[in-house]
């Protein structure tokens, strides 16, 4: 479990500002009393996701699988293939049946659109509590 004094940095990628806002609003600033505050790095393009992840310091990446022109599943696969120490990735899928695509991308979790705050919160909590690989 992360150090409770250092804020957790969550990268949120979508080309749609409303999707990014829904994700951040669903998670809030404090997901659970046992975890530190959450801070967000909003990203609207695929190249910026890669740049931010290369810089490091991200505790979790939430990638929109429906983003265009670069979808979050392809980015997730690229990050898992290229980063020696990649943080957990959650992919937002277009529908529940797309979970298999998220598995292909090597993302640790998938949550379907539209974002359900309870499902997203539980999923993110489990990823942030999981031991680092």
Curated annotation (Swiss-Prot):
GO biological process: phosphorelay signal transduction system
Keywords: Phosphoprotein, Two-component regulatory system
InterPro entries in alphabetical order: CheY-like_superfamily, Sig_transdc_resp-reg_receiver
Gene Ontology CC terms, in alphabetical order: peptidoglycan-based cell wall
Name used for this protein in its record: Uncharacterized response regulatory protein Rv3143
Top-rank lineage group of the source organism: Bacteria
Residue intervals of the Response regulatory domain: 9-128
Sites bearing 4-aspartylphosphate, chain numbering: 64
Organism: Mycobacterium tuberculosis (strain ATCC 25618 / H37Rv)
């Amino acid at each position: 479990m992360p150090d409770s004094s250092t804020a957790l940095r969550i990268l949120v990628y979508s080309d749609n500002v409303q999707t990014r806002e829904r994700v951040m609003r669903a998670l809030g600033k404090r997901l659970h009393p046992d975890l530190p505050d959450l801070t967000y790095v909003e990203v609207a393009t695929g190249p910026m996701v890669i740049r931010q992840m290369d810089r490091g310091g991200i505790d979790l990446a939430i990638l929109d699988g429906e983003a265009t022109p670069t979808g979050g599943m392809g980015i997730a696969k690229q990050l898992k293939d290229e980063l020696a120490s990649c943080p957990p990735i959650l992919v937002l899928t277009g529908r529940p049946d797309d979970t298999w695509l998220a598995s292909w991308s090597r993302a640790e979790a998938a949550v379907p659109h539209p974002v359900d705050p309870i499902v997203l919160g539980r999923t993110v909590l489990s990823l942030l509590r999981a031991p680092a690989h």
